[in-house]
Amino acid sequence: MQVSVESTQGLERKLTVTIAAEAFDKEYNSRVHHLAKTQRVDGFRPGKVPTSVVTKRFGAGIFQEVAGELMQRNFSEAVMAEKLNLAARPNFEPQAREKGQDFTFTATFEVYPEVTLSPLEALSIEKDSAEVTDADLDKMIETLRKQHAEWNAVEREAANDDQVTLDFEGSIDGEVFEGGKAEGFDIVLGSGKMIPGFEAGIVGHAAGSEFTIDVNFPEDYHAEQLKGKAVQFAIKLTKVEEQILPEITPEFVQKFGVENGELETLKHDIKQNMVRELSQALKNSAKDKVLNALVENNEIEIPKALVEDEIVVLRKQAMERYAKEMDPENLPELPAELFKEQAEKRVKVGFLLGEVINVNELTVDQEKVAALIESAASAYDNPAEVIAYYKNNKEMMQNMENVALEEQAVDFIIEKAKVTEVNKSFDEVMNKVVA
């Protein structure tokens, strides 16, 4: 076997392998003789079919079979001999061959990049810091009251925080567009659920009024055909309701699982949840900033095949999210280009974090794994049952170990990098998570 390796472009390699004629013909002839003994052919006794007949009838198929197996086998040997680290499946191309000639094929594929990290000490990272204050807790209680509010119809002009019921029909350049019409639609004014300007255009109008609103779809709107377009909505306002908040009584408190009905117990439970959510949000924020700094400070080539695989994953996740909120028939087109930048970043992060782990010989901290499992379980009614489920599920334990090792790598980078803490409010941190 003769092997040569050529670097074609970026991480792409072209491997050319030549197999001696004797080796190919030996394998080919062996298959022919085997078929001559086992293949049933009309006009010949079993086991007495001439090899010339087998070659004439089945030669092309035998050639394909032998070529395929020899390419796979010799490619694997060549890759090991040349110490190539494949990032994706190869594309084989056999060359034409006459009997008695050597058999040559090429295999084109991408390899993993060689990663050299810049010093972690050179990274500059701003790390958010926040805490849950009494004001944050009071605001959360107020949010709970709003979630359980009643709505009473009023005979006045609509204002922010009112709930309105309306019919609307949108048109662009005088033409009604698909998905731009609804009847009996409820919206709380000021909630920001509609495109900018829509809710504000309803403020000041009373039930029974009909009017138009001129607004523009945002440039980043999910429907490609509507991005940045000017639209006019014809509105018929049928109802205006004001919000009536419930009093904080023992009965109200008991709605949230607090059996004793005491407000202080409810506040204690809510604060625990807020602290846990804030802690996770701060951890995620720090991780994002570490990974961004890591990518920005390290040039790295990445295999196109891995980016394409990641795009498939991201697109599938996006479609699943849309499917929960929209009619399947109205799901938007999601071209690969939408996910390319995010996919490239995720692939780069994988290589760079992997190198941090390898170079610094980081290993899974089982105490951290246990802490992560306990944290995940604490959100359930029966934490012990959830913990046991993790421990008895090999795949879930492996996933949690991967998460732990990744967090260890992030913590290691934070220890080495230049870190500046930035004080923020609970809302600033959590609203960023929602956004």
From Swiss-Prot:
Q: What is its EC number?
A: 5.2.1.8
Recorded catalytic reaction(s): these are: [protein]-peptidylproline (omega=180) = [protein]-peptidylproline (omega=0)
Q: Which GO terms describe its biological process?
A: 'de novo' cotranslational protein folding; cell division; chaperone-mediated protein folding; protein transport; protein unfolding
Keyword hit for Cell division: yes
Instruction: State any single GO MF term.
Output: peptidyl-prolyl cis-trans isomerase activity
Localization = Cytoplasm
What GO cellular component term, any one, is given? cytoplasm
Question: What is the protein's major site of localization?
Answer: cytoplasm
Q: Does the keyword Cytoplasm apply?
A: yes
Tell me the ranges covered by the PPIase FKBP-type domain, including all copies.
161-246
Q: Which SUPFAM superfamilies match?
A: FKBP-like, Triger factor/SurA peptide-binding domain-like, Trigger factor ribosome-binding domain
**By its UniProt entry, which InterPro entries does this protein fall under?**
PPIase_dom_sf, PPIase_FKBP_dom, Trig_fac, Trigger_fac_C, Trigger_fac_C_sf, Trigger_fac_ribosome-bd_bac, Trigger_fac_ribosome-bd_sf, Trigger_fact/SurA_dom_sf
Q: Which NCBIfam families match?
A: tig
The family assignment reads: Belongs to the FKBP-type PPIase family. Tig subfamily.
Which PANTHER family does the protein's record reference? Answer: TRIGGER FACTOR CHAPERONE AND PEPTIDYL-PROLYL CIS/TRANS ISOMERASE, TRIGGER FACTOR-LIKE PROTEIN TIG, CHLOROPLASTIC
Q: Copy the domain comment.
A: Consists of 3 domains; the N-terminus binds the ribosome, the middle domain has PPIase activity, while the C-terminus has intrinsic chaperone activity on its own.
Name the UniProt record assigns to this protein: Trigger factor
Question: From which organism does this entry originate?
Answer: Psychromonas ingrahamii (strain DSM 17664 / CCUG 51855 / 37)
Instruction: Specify the taxonomic lineage.
Output: Bacteria, Pseudomonadati, Pseudomonadota, Gammaproteobacteria, Alteromonadales
